[in-house]
Structures are given as structure tokens and as C-alpha cells.
Amino acid sequence: LGKFEAGPHFLEVGDTFKITTDDILGTKDLVSTTFKGLPKDVQPGDFLLIDDGKVRVEVTEASDTVVTTRVVVAGNVSDNKGINLPGVAVNVPALSEKDEDDLRWALRIGADLIALSFVRDAQDVQRVHFIMDEEGRRVPVIAKIEKPQAVDHLEEIIDAFDAIMVARGDLGVELPLEAVPIVQKKAVEFARRMAKPVIVATQMLESMIDNPVPTRAETSDVANAVLDGADAVMLSGETSVGKYPVQVVETMARIVDSTEEHGLDRIAPLNVTPRTQGGAITMAAVEVANFVRAKYLCIFTESGDSARRMSRLRSSIPML
């Protein structure tokens, strides 16, 4: 969704809500979208899910520029919330015009990382690299795993991109909820095997948007992501719109620190045959270090590849 003149707005069941491709400032009844192909990709009877499925609307009419819907599940809508079309074959490029403009701007101001949304296959990174080459600057590109097509092409995506993010919010809209934990574990396992960083994101401490302490289930969720072997856990709404942004960061850091201190030995060993010389050397180095009870592991690296391959082994010996 685009921006609203005011808001957020609460949509009641039965309300008419229109989405237009025209560039306007939205009201409770009509708002713009950056996805210009939306009217062509939907038809009456299709369902649109807004803000990770918190609001559900049914398409009643689609013209050249406006999609008219009826609210089925009530909720708030506000600036820049995502729209999902589960089961609809969306004809949209990996990068919209705005995405390309934003990418160029990010490169010019010195962004360290770029995350690409709604990746479907390994080819989606090509346009990003083309623009980076035009701008004369390449930085790592993270593939956000949030579409069923991405799950189907997971290994080739991990191979093509520099890192992946398991974006569980959109995944839980596009896939059955019960499938998300398995996809998360599968993605983390594949990324570790291929020595690519993997981030677990979305709704990790969601209740802290409004509360100063998390639920016990959320605490376990963060810890389990660490125990799965994830390289990073990420906050989103908790810090962008939440009431307790500092407390939520401190809370997540405490959970991660405690899990790493007491649970590193619970992370499943990486039972793979190394594919590269760097992989073989780092695996051998960890075995030797454990055998001689070394105090530290020193890693000499220029590209960072050896450090990543050493990190994925999750040794309890500190690394320099």
C-alpha cells in the first residue's frame, strides 16, 4: 500500500476498500499501490491479504487502474503495509521502478547490504547486480525467502545470493502456517551447508510492540532460531513502530547471549563433506583445535569466505 493522508484506518467487515495504481494520498476508502500490475493480476473472487494477513479483503471488481474489494477480516491499514496474493500468479519483475531508484540511492549513500523482497529464483539477483555495476559499487545481496517459488528453488537461490533471510511473516501468508517452521529449519540447514549467512526474521518478539516483556513462547522462538544454527535474528515492527524499541533490543540480545553461552553444544553438527579447499581446511582446523584444547582460533581471510566457513561450524572456541 501507498501512504494515507491520516491513519491508521480501521476497516470493518463489509466495508468497501479500493486500491488504485494512481499516485494519490490515501483515505479510508481508497489508497494507492506501488504494484502497477495489480488490476491485471486479480479477478473477482480473489483474496488479498494486507499486513501479513491481519486484514483480508475479497476482490469484487477490477478495472484498468482500480481494484474494488470487500473487507472480510477487519483490521487496521496504514502506510506502506504489504499486500499478498496467495495462489495468484503475479506478473511482476524482481525490481519495480521504485525499487531500482531506491537501490541506486542506497548504493550512493553507502549502504552495506541490500535485501531483495519476494525472490522467486536465482535469476532475480541479476538485475540487482546490473544496477550495482552501473553505479560502480557491489555490496552483498540478501534474498528474502517469502514466496512458495523461493522455497522450491531454495538451494539455487542460496548459491546465487550472498545471504538469505527467512521472512516468516509473508511466508506464513503464502504457505500454510504449519509449514513455516519446517521451511525455517530447512533454509538454515541449507545455508549452513553452503556457508552462506542466514537471518531469521518477523514476529520474533511481536508482543513487545505493546508490552515491555515478551511471551515465553517468543523467548523460546528466538532461542530456537539460534539453536537451529541461524547467523542472525532480526526485529522489524518491534523497533519500527513499537512502544519499547530499546527494551526489545536488549531483551533479544540477552536471549541470544544466554543461548550461545549454554546451548552451543546443542546445535546440530554440520555433517557434510566439504566442497571447497577452504571448507576442508576450516573443518580440519576446528577438529585439531578441539583435540589440543586451543584457547583461540585465528582466521586469516581477505574475502571473508574462510571466516564464514569457520563460523558455520559453531565451535565453542573463540575465533579471531
Regions found by a protein language model. Give the residues of each.
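Non-catalytic helical/linker scaffolds that mediate oligomerization, partner binding
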Residues: L1-L320
